[in-house]
């Protein structure tokens, strides 16, 4: 028969508006900004083609396979309200296009080449629907929310953390001292900063030893289980696992990884190691804003959050809504639910484009961190609820009397907010009053209230629908 060589419009093959999506399809919602003169159907079809089976011209080898079985399909396009020349293109991918249990492969396919495509001015992946048929091929988080609570024996309240500052420059012994004071004062966790790996002023092994010592001393004195996120992120996967092994040998409860800079392959390996060896895994999202901050290009953080739940992590940073970093309330709560819950309904007002069913994959605890202090505590308790980690770096270490009193202030504020909430008080309305009352019987909290009474980070949010 021969085949018809030449270049033909993508939309003839890849735009299929009458396609019925299958339960096993991976669905993607892209925000497409076509170049002038490119019709939206062609742009949407081009995205489907270039992220699945297509190439720029008809090829003879197409005849050796069944394109109908394997091609991505753009099945719906809608204009974005209030934006000129922007469309949401919905693409369905057959499950067979993806390697099982590999976030790396999923992203290489869906967001690999297509983002440099000339016919598009910009392209953003807004959401993915991961079908159970695919999510069940992943281990997911090493432990999940309930197992973590049981390991730590902490229930009915958010957990408290603190990133040790100055993030770079402390010796291991001084670093360990800062860890001890924070944990002794009443925090549940302290944290290595994301860029603390193994630098000349503090090699990883020394830090691990001094932090473990700090942890056990604080545990003995408070009778509570304590943790310090030991950052295992390293230049090679082998070195990363070596650090995790040493953490396990020290008997500490939790390690940490920078999952975007470290990469999904490394992260998934570490998550498997953590489940096999009883370590919790804290995930930092360093580099996320490079990918997710532009409104019209890149990937929304909710996609990176879903990818992390597949790859594996027990905590992940998720913005604060109130501090110094990005995060609009409804949108943030949208992906917080995607991290914690088993079943999340489609809700476009929160940026959730698809109903997501995680079946039995464990949940991830969202971490609120960045520019928050005691006055934010009522809002954070209300917004994030019990299954969260509230992390105050400067908001602990910046206390005028030092780290331990800073930790005391945060713990007192948190306990006051939880108690008030359980008594039925309205944290949003009475928050300041609740903190003021509590500070009457806690000099540490009173001092903290005084220092940060006027601090706000007020800028318009970038992350809008």
Swiss-Prot record:
Binding site residues for substrate: 113, 163, 167, 285, 317, 369
Active-site residue numbers: 165, 284
Amino acids binding Mg(2+): 191, 193-194
Transcription found in the keyword field: no
Cofactor requirements of the protein: Mg(2+)
Keywords associated with the record: Calvin cycle, Carbon dioxide fixation, Chloroplast, Disulfide bond, Lyase, Magnesium, Metal-binding, Methylation, Monooxygenase, Oxidoreductase, Photorespiration, Photosynthesis, Plastid
Modified residues (N6,N6,N6-trimethyllysine): 4
Catalysed conversion reaction: 2 (2R)-3-phosphoglycerate + 2 H(+) = D-ribulose 1,5-bisphosphate + CO2 + H2O; D-ribulose 1,5-bisphosphate + O2 = 2-phosphoglycolate + (2R)-3-phosphoglycerate + 2 H(+)
Annotated EC: 4.1.1.39
Chain positions of site Transition state stabilizer: 324
Identification of the protein by name: Ribulose bisphosphate carboxylase large chain
């Amino acid at each position: 028969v021969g085949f018809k060589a030449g270049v033909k419009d993508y939309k003839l093959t890849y735009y299929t508006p009458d396609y019925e999506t299958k339960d096993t399809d991976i669905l993607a919602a892209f925000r497409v900004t076509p170049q002038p003169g490119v019709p939206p159907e062609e742009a949407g079809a081009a995205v489907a083609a270039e992220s699945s089976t297509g190439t720029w011209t008809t090829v003879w080898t197409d005849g050796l396979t069944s394109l109908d079985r394997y091609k991505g399909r753009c099945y719906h396009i809608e204009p974005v309200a209030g934006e000129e020349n922007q469309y949401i293109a919905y693409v369905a991918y057959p499950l067979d296009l993806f390697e099982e249990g590999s976030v790396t492969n999923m992203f290489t396919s869906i967001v690999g080449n297509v983002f440099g495509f000339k016919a598009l001015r910009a392209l953003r992946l807004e959401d993915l629907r991961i079908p159970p048929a695919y999510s069940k091929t992943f281990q997911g988080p090493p432990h999940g929310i309930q197992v973590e609570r049981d390991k730590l024996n902490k229930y009915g309240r958010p957990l408290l953390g603190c990133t040790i500052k100055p993030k770079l420059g402390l010796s291991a012994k001084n670093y360990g001292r800062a860890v001890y004071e924070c944990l002794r004062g009443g925090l549940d966790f302290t944290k290595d900063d994301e860029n603390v790996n193994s630098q000349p002023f503090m090699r990883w092994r020394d830090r691990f030893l001094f932090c473990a010592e700090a942890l056990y001393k604080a545990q003995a004195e408070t009778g509570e289980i304590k943790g310090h996120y030991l950052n295992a992120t390293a230049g090679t996967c082998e070195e990363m696992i070596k650090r995790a092994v040493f953490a396990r040998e020290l008997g500490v409860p939790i390690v940490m990884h920078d999952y975007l800079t470290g990469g999904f392959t490394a992260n998934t390996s570490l998550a498997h190691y953590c489940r096999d060896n009883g370590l919790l895994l804290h995930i930092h999202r360093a580099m996320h804003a490079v990918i997710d901050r532009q409104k019209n290009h890149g990937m929304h953080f909710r996609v990176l959050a879903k990818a992390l739940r597949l790859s594996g992590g027990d905590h992940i940073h998720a913005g604060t809504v109130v501090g110094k970093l990005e995060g609009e309330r409804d949108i943030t709560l949208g992906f917080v639910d995607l991290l914690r819950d088993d079943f999340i309904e489609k809700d476009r007002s929160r940026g959730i484009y698809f109903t997501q069913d995680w079946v039995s994959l464990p949940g991830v605890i969202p971490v609120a961190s960045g520019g928050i202090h005691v006055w934010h505590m009522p809002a954070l308790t209300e917004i994030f609820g019990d299954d969260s980690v509230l992390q105050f770096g400067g908001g602990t270490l910046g206390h005028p009397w030092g780290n331990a009193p800073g930790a005391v202030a945060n713990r007192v504020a948190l306990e006051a907010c939880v108690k008030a909430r359980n008594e039925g008080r309205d944290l949003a309305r009475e928050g300041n009053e609740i903190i003021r009352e509590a500070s009457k019987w806690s000099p540490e909290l009173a001092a903290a209230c005084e220092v940060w009474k006027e601090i706000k980070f007020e800028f318009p949010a970038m992350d809008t629908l």
